[in-house]
Amino acid sequence: MATLLIDNYDSFTYNVYQYLCSQGADVVVYRNDKITVDEIVKLNPVNIVISPGPGHPSHDAGVSRDVISYFAGKLPILGICMGEQCIFEVFGGTVSYAGDILHGKTSTIKHDNRGLFKNVPQDNQVTRYHSLAGMPSTLPEVLEVTATTDDGVIMGVRHKKYTVEGVQFHPESILCEHGHTMISNFLSLRGGNWDENPAAGVLAQKVPAAATEKAAQEASPAISTPPTCSTILSRIYAQRVKDVQAAKEVPGQSQADLQKLLNLHIAPPLRDVVNRLKESSPALMAEVKRASPSKGNIDITVNAAEQALQYALAGASVISVLTEPKWFRGSLNDLRQVREACPLLPNRPCILRKTFLLDTYQILEARLYGADTVLLIVAMMSDEDLRELYQYSVSLGMEPLVEVNNAEEMARANAVGAKLIGVNNRGLHSFDVDMETTSRLAEMVPEGTILCALSGISTRADVETYVSQGVHGLLVGEALMRAWNLKEFVAELLGYKKKDPVPHTPVSRQVQVKICGISSVEAAVEAATAGADLVGLIFAEKSKRQVTVAKAREIVDALHKLPTRSSQLPVKSQKSIDWFDVQTEMVEQRVPWRPLVVGVFVNQSIEYMSQVAVEAGLDLIQLHGTESAEIARFLPVPVIKAFHMDASSFHAGQIPYVTQPGNNQLLLLDAKVPSLPMDRQGGLGQKFDWTIAQDIVNVKRPGCSKEQTFPVILAGGLDPSNISEAIQQVRPWAVDVSSGVETDGKKDLKKIRAFVEKAKSINLQ
């Protein structure tokens, strides 16, 4: 009589075969779809082994489940990995995600020293290749747990009456300790019941009444069923408790320290998440998600900030950032980077910190790292904790998203007064998805509360169903992360009407012209009447073109008295989303009326520049020295920041520094004269390297088309003789000239007019 090995199409099947043979078994192997129960009956095997295999035992195990059902109680059966899962399901249990995806990893197990584990030491190292496991909460009455990992994952089960055993690990692996002993223990079994195998020690043994407490303690350790065997949620909870405690113990990161940082205004400004969601219907809540307990790695290499920016540009109202490190591969740094990537958008989405919150410390962390809202999972906390965390979040200005999964949790969320409730279609105890969960709970949401559907959403049909039931917000993660064309997928998901493709028609434009170094009313008026858009007045102390505040006021007044050049502001056909595009458009909307006056300063105090701007009536300030661009935040008018580029030392790595948004509204590129100090740069006729300007003009920006160039003001060595070539080669937003329209150090009115006319004669597309 032979041992029958059912092959579930697994690469380890013949490792199992080898181990069985090494212990003296005569083994025959059949694949799970190449033999029937009737044929097995005719084989008359002495015992049966169900091999590991890919997939789920419900639909990928072939004849394995039928074999267990028929032969249990007739002969010994051993299930390995998927084989064990088949045993678990055949007798009424549920197999679902185990909380980790393990491939060739070892774990320490505790076991009951009986049956398969007789004479196997405790803390035995076993090898695991699985992502599924039997759910402890569904353990069938007829089975008992024989082994678990340190964190409670079931590693072995046994039928209480029949000689049926299963192990979730691979005893045939070379890394598994005492695998041969386990196989030998199985092969020693005879018959279909444990009472036929007293040597296995499975059935309860009668002990003398005089047994001492010490003897009882020395007995084989029992493997308990739930709650000792944990769900995924409880395992995550336990890990987060450790993580929070560790974070609090980092010097400078205590709760008191974080509160000090908040008081110092380290946290960025907030947006009201409820109002932001109301701006769109339905509102997309897009999730940055590298991995998950149920799916494993989704996109482990994704850059959180880049992904978030793509979500924002596709129309997301909220961006959810997973910051849990172990199961979701996220971090607080992801949250910070996402927040820093989005604030320069005209209508940025709100940022949600999505993690397993259990302490006010984590909410304070979220606020400091840039979140506008946080996730509170009702299933993870008592009513008292839920109320405390909810009220604390609201006290920081963040209305939390309160997550529920059933009617009892919905009632608890309503009781705390949640204004934003999300129904998670994924059960956190098993991580199984039930898309009807939101539908069942929708009617329990009070009027005025925003309802969101979380998890499992991937099609337009899903969205239509939920919207018809009153759902307003839709949290989508994996489907977005895997989308080939994100914008098209979002448009389809939200039901945006497809527009007929319109051929790209280049729009011609003229460059803006700035005449700098103006020191007389006559020159200013000539520049204005010639068509200049900006007039520069220099206040730098060491400049030969320096003007007084009184002279500047005189020039400004003269320009204000000129007739307006247009009675109609330009209308943009496309909404701008880039910081610099928005700023240049604001300037363009003002210059048709009259030229704007720019005050040029070199390393002068904020107080002085502000005073001059107010007294002289300046429209813009140009920082032409080594000032930090951050100074722009403290000045009363928009700022042009000049960057003096040394062609001999320029590197592409400097471009992100030059094009950094959020401070100066405009940027100017000028040549650097290495022999002169920084407070003497500019206005010298030194030609700027146009190839450097081209590199900056052609820099790619998120959300901008290939045709959109980066708006720069080109300066350095320009004059009427080369301005046409410069514009055609560089394609700048504006050009700046000073010495190039002078004769003998004074502004030449003819050159001014010639320069403006030539610059304006070129139409760029």
Swiss-Prot record:
The protein's superkingdom reads: Eukaryota
A Pfam family recorded for this sequence = PRAI
| Ranges for domain Glutamine amidotransferase type-1 | 2-196
Provide the residue positions that the database annotates as binding L-glutamine. Answer: 53-55, 85, 131-132
Q: CDD domains, per this entry?
A: GATase1_Anthranilate_Synthase (cd01743), IGPS (cd00331), PRAI (cd00405)
E.C. designation(s) = 4.1.3.27, 4.1.1.48, 5.3.1.24
Q: Name one GO molecular function term.
A: anthranilate synthase activity
Instruction: Tell me which GO cellular component terms the UniProt record holds.
Output: cytosol
Q: Where is the catalytic site?
A: 81 (nucleophile), 170 (for gatase activity), 172 (for gatase activity)
The biological processes this protein is annotated with in GO are: L-tryptophan biosynthetic process
Q: Where is this region: N-(5'-phosphoribosyl)anthranilate isomerase?
A: 512-765
Record's catalysed reaction(s) = N-(5-phospho-beta-D-ribosyl)anthranilate = 1-(2-carboxyphenylamino)-1-deoxy-D-ribulose 5-phosphate; 1-(2-carboxyphenylamino)-1-deoxy-D-ribulose 5-phosphate + H(+) = (1S,2R)-1-C-(indol-3-yl)glycerol 3-phosphate + CO2 + H2O; chorismate + L-glutamine = anthranilate + pyruvate + L-glutamate + H(+)
**Which stretches does the entry tag as region Indole-3-glycerol phosphate synthase?**
231-494
Pathway(s) of this molecule: Amino-acid biosynthesis; L-tryptophan biosynthesis; L-tryptophan from chorismate: step 1/5; Amino-acid biosynthesis; L-tryptophan biosynthesis; L-tryptophan from chorismate: step 3/5; Amino-acid biosynthesis; L-tryptophan biosynthesis; L-tryptophan from chorismate: step 4/5
Q: Which UniProt keywords apply?
A: Amino-acid biosynthesis, Aromatic amino acid biosynthesis, Decarboxylase, Glutamine amidotransferase, Isomerase, Lyase, Multifunctional enzyme, Tryptophan biosynthesis
Which PANTHER family does the entry link to? Answer: MULTIFUNCTIONAL TRYPTOPHAN BIOSYNTHESIS PROTEIN (PTHR43418:SF4), MULTIFUNCTIONAL TRYPTOPHAN BIOSYNTHESIS PROTEIN-RELATED (PTHR43418)
Summary of the function given for this chain in its UniProt record: Trifunctional enzyme bearing the Gln amidotransferase (GATase) domain of anthranilate synthase, indole-glycerolphosphate synthase, and phosphoribosylanthranilate isomerase activities.
Instruction: Please report the name of this protein according to its UniProt entry.
Output: Multifunctional tryptophan biosynthesis protein
The organism's lineage? Eukaryota, Fungi, Fungi incertae sedis, Mucoromycota, Mucoromycotina
Q: Which gene encodes it?
A: trp1
